[in-house]
């Protein structure tokens, strides 16, 4: 059985880890980095770039460079969050036929799971390069507050990337695993505050140790799936745009290239202000108008940044109160606070969290890597490599159905430990009703329409009866991934209908299969491209070597041979500029054949040079011989 890898599929950065000799190891990607930017670029010549290479070309290709795609995964186009992003992202967010939020790239609509799959493929390849064997199974993390549609979409992304997703686990829970596994922590209650690039979670987790077995039980979770570092960046970008407009009278929002440069500079400035009190955002030639080029040079202090994002940090405090209340605990019951996610490096965030809990957060957990490490540990548990660890996670939101009067009736309440199963009997609202529609909802609001609709299905053929007499048993079954399966059964006739909730949004099986096939075709295209580059490089090497030998041969080479070689060289140089591998190989072979005489001359010249060098060395050695007397000295005993 191969390794089950752990992947933290982040909004801003992603990370992959494996269990190696009983320890979790974070792997370096092909660029030598332990985290990979979750950025995907579609270039003009059809290449797909992921990570740092995609980030590097973003300034010149802003419309086709996609970032923060996790904020769109499993979302409807009409969702408030998708509409907010539509107005600020440099790329185009559009509605899919099924109403989902998709992205338009080079005139084609692409689904967020398909885009995220490109990042997962890079993580998969990173692990394969390290292990030297194929990887087909993974544990992928999601924000604890992700709903059913978002979890399902993440699983779909895994499938498109060629991975069997063995388990979806919550990011704070994964961080707790990373923290608690190798420490003699005893019985403790911890709070994991996870503020990443695009999402925020708080989880209250109890770690119990009994006879050497550690149980990680999530007591409560809360959060905001649209609050993260990207929002902090946006605040700073907006401030810089307004300042520039005041100074120069020019709105940079109309210039996508300038906005891309500004995004990079704002992110860098934000990071610098975690350790410095002030920084300069200096962007020469950021744009130009009729009067000439314009430059940006704006000083930003830490205090200014804090004033811009104060309300965002405050927004993260309310879920802390709710999570503690749901867990039935007070601040004094929390023994350790763990910070996860790059945005928690901001001093203001650390201070607010410390003030709330009345204690300093721990500094021995790497906020960028802890989640991937925890995912790898869970992979080890599933593979049987890690013993004595039990993980009890919860469902973040209540699940129920719409009942008479458009009311949401919960069957499974939030923070219920999963996997779980619950049944409830309902009845008909009309006399002789022959069918019922089961409308499945997720959320905490009383009015059905105020909750997230996960889907609906019909149960037909109900036995005719007076209103309220028919007995319809509805069963909700949540698996370990937090994904919901629903069935409805007429208890009188035994007639039953079942569905695995595929949200009213989401990809259908046919779409997923097509994307899997597309990914396989891309993999084949990538392999062919690598072979073409290799063939080109060999041809270039031959061209360079042949030209050098031609120069050295001078007039010693017969004119007809020289003409034939020159012609073959020209043909190969033309072929190398093209995309036809077979053509390059054929022209390479043709050059090798006509260069026979030249090669013989070059080899003869090398042999002669070798012989001359040998003779010189021998003469040198003779000259260096020195007559000397010597005396044998016996060792003293």
Curated annotation (Swiss-Prot):
This protein's name: Chaperone protein DnaK
Name of the gene: dnaK
HAMAP family in the cross-refs: DnaK
Cross-referenced Gene3D superfamilies: 1.20.1270.10, 3.30.420.40, Actin, Chain A, domain 4 (3.90.640.10), Substrate Binding Domain Of DNAk, Chain A, domain 1 (2.60.34.10)
Gene induction: By stress conditions e.g. heat shock.
Pfam family, one: HSP70
Annotated organism of origin: Serratia proteamaculans (strain 568)
Modification Phosphothreonine, positions: 199
InterPro entries: ATPase_NBD, Chaperone_DnaK, Heat_shock_70_CS, HSP70_C_sf, HSP70_peptide-bd_sf, Hsp_70_fam
Region entry Disordered, spans: 603-637
GO molecular function annotation: ATP binding; ATP-dependent protein folding chaperone; unfolded protein binding
Low complexity bias (residue ranges): 603-618
Source organism phylogeny: Bacteria, Pseudomonadati, Pseudomonadota, Gammaproteobacteria, Enterobacterales
Lineage top rank: taxon: Bacteria
Function, in words: Acts as a chaperone.
Family, similarity comment: Belongs to the heat shock protein 70 family.
Protein keywords: ATP-binding, Chaperone, Nucleotide-binding, Phosphoprotein, Stress response
């Amino acid at each position: 059985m191969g390794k089950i890898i752990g992947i933290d599929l982040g909004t801003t950065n992603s990370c992959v880890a494996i269990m190696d000799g009983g320890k979790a190891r974070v792997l370096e990607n092909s660029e030598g980095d332990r985290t990979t930017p979750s950025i995907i670029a579609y270039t003009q010549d059809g290449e797909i770039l992921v990570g740092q290479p995609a980030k590097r070309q973003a300034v010149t290709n802003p419309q086709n460079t996609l970032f923060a795609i996790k904020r769109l995964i499993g979302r409807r186009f009409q969702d408030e969050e998708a509409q907010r992003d539509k107005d600020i992202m440099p790329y185009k967010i559009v509605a899919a036929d099924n109403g989902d939020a998709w992205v338009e790239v080079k005139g084609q609509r692409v689904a967020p799971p398909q885009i995220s799959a490109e990042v997962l493929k890079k993580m998969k390849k990173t692990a394969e390069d390290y292990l030297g064997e194929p990887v087909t199974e993974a544990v992928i993390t999601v924000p604890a507050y992700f709903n059913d549609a978002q979890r399902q979409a993440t699983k779909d992304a895994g499938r498109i990337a060629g991975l069997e997703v063995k388990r979806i686990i919550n990011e704070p829970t994964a961080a707790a695993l990373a923290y608690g596994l190798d420490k003699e922590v005893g019985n403790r209650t911890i709070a994991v505050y996870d503020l990443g690039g695009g999402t925020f979670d708080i989880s209250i987790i109890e770690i119990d140790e009994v006879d050497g077995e550690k149980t990680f039980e999530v007591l409560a979770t809360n959060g905001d799936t649209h609050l993260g570092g990207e929002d902090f960046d946006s605040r700073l970008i907006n401030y810089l745009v307004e300042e520039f407009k005041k100074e120069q009278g020019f709105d940079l929002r109309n210039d996508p290239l300038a906005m891309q440069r500004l995004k990079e500079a704002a992110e860098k400035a934000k990071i610098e202000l975690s350790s410095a009190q002030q920084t300069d955002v200096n962007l020469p030639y950021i744009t130009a108008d009729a009067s000439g080029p314009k430059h940006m040079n704006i000083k930003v202090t830490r205090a200014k940044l804090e004033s811009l994002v104060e309300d965002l940090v405050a927004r993260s405090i309310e879920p802390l109160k709710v999570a503690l209340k749901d867990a039935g605990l007070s601040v004094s019951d929390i023994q350790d606070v763990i910070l996860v996610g790059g945005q928690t490096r901001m001093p203001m965030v650390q201070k607010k969290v410390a003030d709330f809990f009345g204690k300093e957060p721990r500094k021995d957990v790497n906020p960028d890597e802890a989640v991937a490490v925890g995912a790898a540990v869970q992979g080890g548990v599933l593979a049987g490599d890690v013993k004595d660890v039990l993980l009890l996670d919860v469902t973040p939101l209540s699940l129920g159905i719409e009942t008479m009067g458009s009311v949401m009736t919960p069957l499974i309440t939030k923070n219920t430990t999963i996997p779980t199963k619950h049944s409830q009997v309902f009845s008909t609202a009309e006399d002789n009703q022959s069918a019922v529609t089961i409308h499945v909802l997720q959320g905490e609001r009383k009015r059905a329409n105020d909750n997230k609709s996960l889907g609906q299905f019909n149960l037909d053929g109900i036995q005719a009866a007076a209103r309220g007499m028919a007995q319809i048993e509805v069963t909700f079954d949540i698996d370990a991934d937090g994904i919901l399966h629903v069935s409805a059964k007429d208890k009188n006739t035994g007639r039953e209908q079942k569905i695995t909730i595929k949200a009213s949004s989401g990809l259908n099986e046919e779409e997923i299969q097509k994307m899997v096939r597309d990914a396989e075709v891309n993999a084949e295209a990538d392999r062919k491209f690598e072979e073409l580059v290799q063939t080109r490089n060999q041809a270039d090497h031959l061209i360079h070597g042949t030209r050098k030998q031609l120069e050295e041969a001078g007039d010693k080479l017969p004119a007809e041979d020289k003409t034939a070689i020159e012609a073959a060289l020209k043909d190969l140089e033309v072929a190398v500029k093209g995309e036809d591998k077979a053509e390059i190989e054929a022209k390479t072979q043709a050059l090798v054949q006509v260069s026979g005489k030249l090669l013989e001359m070059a080899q003869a010249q090398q042999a002669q040079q070798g012989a001359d060098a040998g003779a010189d060395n021998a003469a040198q050695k003779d000259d260096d011989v020195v007559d000397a007397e010597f005396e044998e000295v016996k060792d003293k005993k």
